[in-house]
């Protein structure tokens, strides 16, 4: 399973649906996050100016055995095309941002379902987890 930054942030911030997202992660055989999505998650959490919350990201990744996947050249190409097709300003309802495009690319490259929060990826062909 690929995990988007939106799901990671929701779990760490204990947003209303965090438990459901956490349970889905717990049920997965393998968990992967793009290095770009890892950074995006860290930026959001660091912006809260709460050091304990920021530390939870790395603690959670280690605890659940999530693999931070390096961005490959192929993923960069897939992400570029995703932005053209689904990105902000494209007119497509998915309205993917920079970080979303890397989650999308990793899910496409690995042919894995993705866990996310929101409705952006629901407008693409990515399988929900």
Q: Can you annotate each of these PLM segments?
A:
Residues 67-113:
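Active-site neighborhoods of divalent-metal-dependent phosphate/nucleic-acid chemistry enzymes
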Residues 1-33, 46-61:
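Short, well-structured N-terminal submotif of metal-dependent ribonuclease cores
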Residues 104-129:
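Acidic, PIN/NYN-like endoribonuclease modules and their adjacent C-terminal/linker elements
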Residues 8-9, 38, 121-122:
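A generic structural signal for short hydrophobic patches within well-formed alpha-helices
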């Amino acid at each position: 399973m690929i995990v988007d930054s939106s799901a990671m942030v929701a779990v760490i911030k204990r947003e209303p649906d965090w438990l459901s997202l956490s349970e889905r992660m717990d049920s997965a055989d393998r968990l992967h996050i793009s290095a770009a999505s890892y950074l995006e998650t860290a930026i959001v959490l660091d912006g809260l100016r709460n050091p304990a919350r920021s530390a939870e990201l790395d603690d959670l990744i280690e605890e659940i055995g999530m693999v931070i996947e390096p961005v490959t050249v192929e993923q960069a190409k897939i992400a570029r095309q995703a932005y053209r097709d689904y990105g902000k300003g494209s007119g497509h309802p998915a309205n993917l941002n920079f970080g979303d495009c890397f989650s999308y690319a990793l899910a496409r490259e690995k042919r894995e379902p993705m866990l996310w929060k929101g409705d952006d990826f629901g407008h693409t062909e990515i399988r929900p987890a």
